[in-house]
Protein backbone atom coordinates (compact mmCIF):
# COMPACT_ATOMS: atom_id res chain seq x y z
CA UNK A 1 0.00 0.00 0.00
CA UNK A 2 2.82 2.42 0.85
CA UNK A 3 4.26 2.04 -2.63
CA UNK A 4 0.97 2.73 -4.42
CA UNK A 5 0.25 5.62 -2.05
CA UNK A 6 3.64 7.20 -2.76
CA UNK A 7 3.33 6.44 -6.48
CA UNK A 8 0.33 8.76 -6.76
CA UNK A 9 2.53 11.74 -5.87
CA UNK A 10 5.25 11.20 -8.47
CA UNK A 11 3.42 12.70 -11.49
CA UNK A 12 3.98 9.76 -13.84
CA UNK A 13 7.73 10.30 -13.90
CA UNK A 14 8.26 6.54 -13.57
CA UNK A 15 6.28 3.46 -14.44
CA UNK A 16 5.26 1.43 -11.40
CA UNK A 17 8.17 -1.04 -11.55
CA UNK A 18 10.74 1.75 -11.94
CA UNK A 19 9.05 3.48 -9.03
CA UNK A 20 9.21 0.31 -6.92
CA UNK A 21 12.96 0.08 -7.53
CA UNK A 22 13.42 3.76 -6.67
CA UNK A 23 11.24 3.35 -3.56
CA UNK A 24 13.37 0.44 -2.36
CA UNK A 25 16.53 2.44 -2.99
CA UNK A 26 15.24 5.47 -1.07
CA UNK A 27 13.75 3.44 1.79
CA UNK A 28 16.50 1.05 2.90
CA UNK A 29 14.84 0.62 6.30
CA UNK A 30 11.81 -1.05 4.72
CA UNK A 31 12.10 -4.81 4.96
CA UNK A 32 11.72 -6.13 1.42
CA UNK A 33 13.49 -9.41 2.13
CA UNK A 34 10.32 -11.10 3.41
CA UNK A 35 8.17 -9.93 0.50
CA UNK A 36 7.46 -12.03 -2.58
CA UNK A 37 8.82 -9.50 -5.04
CA UNK A 38 7.35 -11.20 -8.10
CA UNK A 39 3.87 -11.09 -6.58
CA UNK A 40 4.41 -7.48 -5.48
CA UNK A 41 5.32 -6.49 -9.05
CA UNK A 42 2.32 -8.40 -10.40
CA UNK A 43 0.03 -6.73 -7.86
CA UNK A 44 1.32 -3.20 -8.49
CA UNK A 45 1.20 -3.60 -12.26
CA UNK A 46 -2.25 -5.17 -12.10
CA UNK A 47 -3.70 -2.40 -9.95
CA UNK A 48 -2.33 0.30 -12.26
CA UNK A 49 -3.40 -1.47 -15.48
CA UNK A 50 -6.91 -2.14 -14.17
CA UNK A 51 -7.38 1.09 -12.27
CA UNK A 52 -10.24 2.38 -14.42
CA UNK A 53 -12.25 -0.82 -13.95
CA UNK A 54 -11.42 -0.90 -10.24
CA UNK A 55 -12.29 2.77 -9.73
CA UNK A 56 -15.57 2.32 -11.61
CA UNK A 57 -16.51 -0.47 -9.19
CA UNK A 58 -15.58 1.65 -6.17
CA UNK A 59 -17.74 4.50 -7.48
CA UNK A 60 -20.61 2.11 -8.23
CA UNK A 61 -20.71 0.74 -4.68
CA UNK A 62 -19.66 3.81 -2.68
CA UNK A 63 -23.01 5.52 -2.89
CA UNK A 64 -22.72 9.31 -2.77
CA UNK A 65 -18.94 9.07 -2.30
CA UNK A 66 -17.05 10.13 -5.43
CA UNK A 67 -13.43 8.97 -5.55
CA UNK A 68 -12.30 12.51 -4.75
CA UNK A 69 -13.97 12.25 -1.30
CA UNK A 70 -12.47 8.90 -0.35
CA UNK A 71 -9.25 9.27 1.66
CA UNK A 72 -6.27 8.05 -0.33
CA UNK A 73 -5.25 5.35 2.16
CA UNK A 74 -8.66 3.72 1.99
CA UNK A 75 -8.77 4.14 -1.78
CA UNK A 76 -5.43 2.38 -2.30
CA UNK A 77 -6.37 -0.42 0.10
CA UNK A 78 -9.61 -1.00 -1.79
CA UNK A 79 -7.84 -0.89 -5.16
CA UNK A 80 -5.46 -3.63 -4.02
CA UNK A 81 -8.24 -5.76 -2.55
CA UNK A 82 -10.46 -5.38 -5.61
CA UNK A 83 -7.59 -6.36 -7.89
CA UNK A 84 -7.11 -9.48 -5.77
CA UNK A 85 -10.84 -10.23 -5.77
CA UNK A 86 -11.10 -9.96 -9.54
CA UNK A 87 -7.80 -11.34 -10.77
CA UNK A 88 -6.10 -13.44 -8.07
CA UNK A 89 -8.36 -16.45 -7.62
CA UNK A 90 -5.83 -18.25 -5.41
CA UNK A 91 -6.40 -15.58 -2.76
CA UNK A 92 -9.62 -16.36 -0.88
CA UNK A 93 -12.22 -13.62 -1.03
CA UNK A 94 -12.35 -13.37 2.77
CA UNK A 95 -8.57 -12.93 2.98
CA UNK A 96 -8.50 -10.08 0.44
CA UNK A 97 -11.31 -8.28 2.26
CA UNK A 98 -10.01 -8.95 5.79
CA UNK A 99 -6.52 -7.67 4.97
CA UNK A 100 -7.91 -4.43 3.55
CA UNK A 101 -10.24 -3.95 6.52
CA UNK A 102 -7.48 -4.71 9.04
CA UNK A 103 -5.07 -2.28 7.38
CA UNK A 104 -7.76 0.39 7.16
CA UNK A 105 -8.27 0.10 10.92
CA UNK A 106 -4.55 0.78 11.41
CA UNK A 107 -3.90 3.43 8.75
CA UNK A 108 -7.31 4.85 7.87
CA UNK A 109 -9.78 7.20 9.49
CA UNK A 110 -12.06 6.04 12.32
CA UNK A 111 -14.94 4.79 10.17
CA UNK A 112 -12.71 3.36 7.46
CA UNK A 113 -13.04 -0.34 8.37
CA UNK A 114 -16.83 -0.42 8.03
CA UNK A 115 -16.71 1.68 4.84
CA UNK A 116 -14.05 -0.52 3.24
CA UNK A 117 -15.78 -3.71 4.37
CA UNK A 118 -19.13 -2.57 2.97
CA UNK A 119 -17.77 -1.68 -0.45
CA UNK A 120 -15.57 -4.75 -0.78
CA UNK A 121 -18.34 -7.03 0.47
CA UNK A 122 -20.77 -5.65 -2.10
CA UNK A 123 -18.23 -6.04 -4.89
CA UNK A 124 -17.45 -9.60 -3.79
CA UNK A 125 -21.13 -10.58 -3.82
CA UNK A 126 -22.15 -8.78 -7.00
CA UNK A 127 -19.08 -8.66 -9.23
CA UNK A 128 -16.73 -11.54 -8.40
CA UNK A 129 -17.28 -14.65 -10.47
CA UNK A 130 -15.23 -17.58 -9.20
CA UNK A 131 -15.65 -21.31 -9.70
From Swiss-Prot:
Organism of derivation: Caldicellulosiruptor saccharolyticus (strain ATCC 43494 / DSM 8903 / Tp8T 6331)
User: SUPFAM superfamilies per the record?
Assistant: NusB-like
What cellular component GO annotations does this protein have?
cytosol
Q: Which GO terms describe its molecular function?
A: RNA binding
Its family? Belongs to the NusB family.
Alphabetical GO biological process terms: DNA-templated transcription termination; transcription antitermination
Provide the alphabetized UniProt keywords: RNA-binding, Transcription, Transcription antitermination, Transcription regulation
Identify the taxonomic lineage of the organism of origin. Answer: Bacteria, Bacillati, Bacillota, Bacillota incertae sedis, Caldicellulosiruptorales
Q: What is the annotated role of this protein in its UniProt record? A: Involved in transcription antitermination. Required for transcription of ribosomal RNA (rRNA) genes. Binds specifically to the boxA antiterminator sequence of the ribosomal RNA (rrn) operons.
- Supply the Pfam families for this chain: NusB
- The molecule here is called Transcription antitermination protein NusB
What PANTHER family does UniProt report for this protein, alphabetically? Answer: ANTITERMINATION NUSB DOMAIN-CONTAINING PROTEIN, N UTILIZATION SUBSTANCE PROTEIN B-RELATED
Amino acid sequence: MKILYAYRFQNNEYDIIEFLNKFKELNPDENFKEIDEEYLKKLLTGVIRNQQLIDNLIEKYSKDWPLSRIPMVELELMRIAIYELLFEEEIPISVAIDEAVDLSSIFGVEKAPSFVNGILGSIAVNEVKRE
